[in-house]
Amino acid sequence: MLQVLLEIKHQVKQASYVHETELNDAQLLVGNLGLRHRRGLREHPHVYDLGEEWNRWTNLPFVFARWVLRNDIEPGNALVIEDSLFTSLQDWSDGLYRVSGPAIPLPIHPQEIHMYTQGLRYFMGRPEEKSVIQFQEYLDKLR
């Protein structure tokens, strides 16, 4: 997504990617590292959330991942898997605020956890499908 945003949205064609230990103008931080430094780094104080940048640009949510099943899965088994996913999602959200402490220590306030998790969507609707199609079209332009 970073390449799409840089090259297509911002017309930055000469971006080069270097190791984090090399001199750089910016860093891409993901996962726990991204959450840990969500307010920026001393040497890089400006923060851009890629999902937020995509949404501002396209007015669509970005689909970072999705669950898919093979076509040859029997319908009954597919329903069991779907039900398991929904149950796990409910258990996760129910237990989110009952945890005695984070599994991975991150300096993050419960209100920030709430705001972060409220932005997550676990269902594919029309906007999400449109977003996947739009992203694929942009990827095709980069080839």
Give residue ranges: language-model regions:
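Pocket-lining segment of extracytoplasmic ligand-binding domains
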Residues: 15-99
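Alpha-helix boundary/capping residues
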Residues: 9, 85-88, 120
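Ligand-binding cleft/hinge of the Venus flytrap
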Residues: 1-16, 97
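Generic solvent-exposed, charged/amphipathic alpha-helical segments
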Residues: 3-7, 86, 136
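An extracytoplasmic/periplasmic, membrane-proximal ligand-sensing/linker region
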Residues: 98-143
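Long, contiguous hydrophobic alpha-helical segments, chiefly transmembrane helices and signal peptides
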Residues: 1-2, 29-31, 63-67, 120, ...
